[in-house]
Amino acid sequence: MKITIAILLSIVIGVTAGDLRTLVYPPFKHTWGIHKGTESKLDMLLGDVTDFDNPQGIAVTRLLAWDDPDDNKDDDELTAYGINGNRDQIIYNTSMYSLGLYGKSGSGKGQFNSPRGISADPAGDVFICDTGNKRIVHIFNDGDELGWKGSFGQDLLVEPHDCSVTEAGTLYVTDRARGTIEVFTYNGEHVRTLGGLVNPRGIAVDHPKITKTRYGYERIFVLDGDGAILRSLDYSGKMLASVNLRDIPEDNSAGKYIALDFYDNVWVTDSAVCKIHKFDKDLKYITSIGECGDDDYQFDYPSGIAIWRRFGQTIVGERHSAQYFWVGTDITRFETSITKEEESDSTVEISLFITDRAYAKIEVKKDDDVVRQIYEHKRLRQGSVSIRWDMKDDAGNRVPPGKYKIEITYEPTYSSYGFFDETIDTEIDIP
């Protein structure tokens, strides 16, 4: 995997991979120990022609023009696009080793005025919310460079903020000023308006035609209320679920942009508290990642986020940089209890909360010897998981009283599978 898949793979700060987390830095051999972009490295790649200046939306895709169908080793080589808002330009990788710029200030061809959201598909189509010009700009990547295709929406849009393609020829656009989601064809024909929102921001759409999605639901995820509320809608605009970001364990949350992974988990950048919030496809809260700062696993005013669904490669834009992660997993709750029933029926209940699907080996040990292997390589679902041990050893005999250790070794099922694992344990006193 070559590091310049990211829009900023201007990346300069190097570390070896650490412990397993919900988002994890890739191992050294995949990134040469590089996972974070800086302005000095951007200058090295492009010359002193631009700086990170109000980064906004990010998009990633695997270009068909780059694909060699006879070589699956290149399937993780992505094209990434990032909006450099105050410079009215797009930063993108022209190859796996070089960056390019597209756009300048203005209202004509190849020009932008305070662009915000961006979305792209494998065929090479790229759409930008040219917010200040009240339009959508359509450009095309032929595998070598970006070229102008046209613009549309000027007669309808007031403040286009973010957009999301379906890969079926339709584009969903949030209009913050109108409180709507506008649906267009790739050719710019207006299909319909979905109303009832208040200052919508980020948007992400699932669709059966989207490359590498597990479910392929016809579903829209949108940040409403200036980023305070995350909603799930069907394609008719009917609300299916919603969650107030201020009800999760954070204060003053303000969601910026959204990305979906392979399983339709919803990842939301929150610039107010320097975190990324993760929800499942039904908008049940899973976890929050990060804190304010510029060290590892910290964020500085996170804005855009993009995930390549097939492998979980994740890019997060910040005030003056970007970070590159893989989707991992974590166990954030590990509790045990003994049921208060008759002795012959007593069991130990193991209660876990898992932030992404995981493979787990679960063993009961006495003085470091395994007395019971509950699971050897069990796939566990995301969220709350309950496992019971009947207090018997591998031979089916009731274990004698004493202190036992329950040990769990788990690893991700997604992009980082085979590269990371984590072992946790707890003691329990069996009467």
Residue spans of the language-model regions?
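A short beta-strand motif characteristic of beta-propeller blades
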Residues: K41-V49, L99-K109, E145-Q154, E189-L194, ...
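Beta-rich, blade/repeat-based domains predominating
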Residues: D48-E77, G108-P122, Q154-T166, L197-Y215, ...
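Glycine-centered tight-turn motifs at strand-turn-strand junctions
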Residues: V370-G402
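Short loop/turn segments that connect beta-strands within beta-propeller blades
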Residues: T94-Y97, F140-D144, T185-E189, D234-K238, ...
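Blade-level signature of beta-propeller repeat domains, shared across WD40, Kelch, NHL, RCC1
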Residues: Y297-I338
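A short helix->beta-strand "capping" segment at the edge of beta-propeller domains
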Residues: G18-P55
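Short loop/turn segments immediately following the C-termini of beta-strands
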Residues: G85-N86, T131-G132, R176, G225, ...
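Conserved beta-propeller blade signature
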Residues: D67, K73-D75, T79-G82, D125-F127, ...
